[in-house]
């Protein structure tokens, strides 16, 4: 887990790399291990998928468990795993939404959909809940993996708000009371700067 780009925090341009997802996954795993994301130890993946991801990208971490990170990190990870399990239906809806918009040519998109869906359940901006360095990095990651969904965010809505709005519109319901985003008194909550 030691590429120069990831150490510089430069995964925004990773899409040019032959293995773009590797750099993003490296950042996500490192952030989770350092307690800088909302993700549980398995990143929202089932044990088999997680083991495959680690074996494929980070074999040096193959024997690591959440318990090996220390008692506090282990406890936090277990709590995050429990919270994810309580919201499994919501996670699945988000995962399906992402997969419906996937590029379709990379099996790693399955992993990324599960990870992004798990991070959507966190309480901060999505890029922070994933442990990424910026909203722009998240945008590039989403455009790379889920372009058919990400390109619909033409008004630059915050990603979590955008995903949940897409789910509401799919089901024929609307969370918002305003007839349009432009007339909404909470416009800044959905479209304001993420700092």
From Swiss-Prot:
InterPro entries in the cross-refs: NifQ
Gene Ontology molecular function: any one: molybdenum ion binding
Family to which the UniProt record says this protein belongs: Belongs to the NifQ family.
Keywords: Molybdenum, Nitrogen fixation
Function: Probably involved in molybdenum processing.
The species this protein was found in: Azotobacter vinelandii
UniProt record, GO biological process: nitrogen fixation
Superkingdom of origin: Bacteria
Record-given protein name: Protein NifQ
């Amino acid at each position: 887990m030691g590429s120069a780009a990831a150490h510089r925090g430069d995964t925004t341009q990773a899409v040019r790399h032959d293995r773009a997802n590797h750099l993003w996954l490296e950042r996500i795993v490192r952030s989770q291990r350092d307690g800088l994301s909302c993700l549980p130890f398995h990143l929202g993946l089932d044990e088999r998928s997680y083991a495959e991801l680690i074996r494929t990208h980070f074999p040096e971490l193959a024997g690591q468990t959440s318990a090996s990170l220390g008692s506090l990190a282990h406890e936090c990870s277990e709590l995050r795993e429990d919270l994810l399990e309580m919201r499994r239906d919501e996670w699945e809806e988000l995962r399906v939404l992402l997969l419906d918009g996937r590029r379709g040519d990379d099996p790693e998109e399955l992993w990324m959909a599960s990870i992004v869906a798990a991070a959507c359940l966190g309480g901060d901006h999505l890029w922070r809940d994933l442990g990424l360095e910026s909203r722009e990095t998240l945008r590039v990651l989403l455009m790379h993996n889920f372009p058919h969904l990400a390109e619909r965010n033409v008004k630059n809505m915050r990603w979590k708000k955008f995903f949940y709005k897409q789910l509401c519109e799919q089901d024929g319901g609307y969370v918002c009371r305003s007839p349009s985003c432009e007339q909404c008194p909470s416009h800044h909550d959905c479209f304001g700067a993420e700092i």
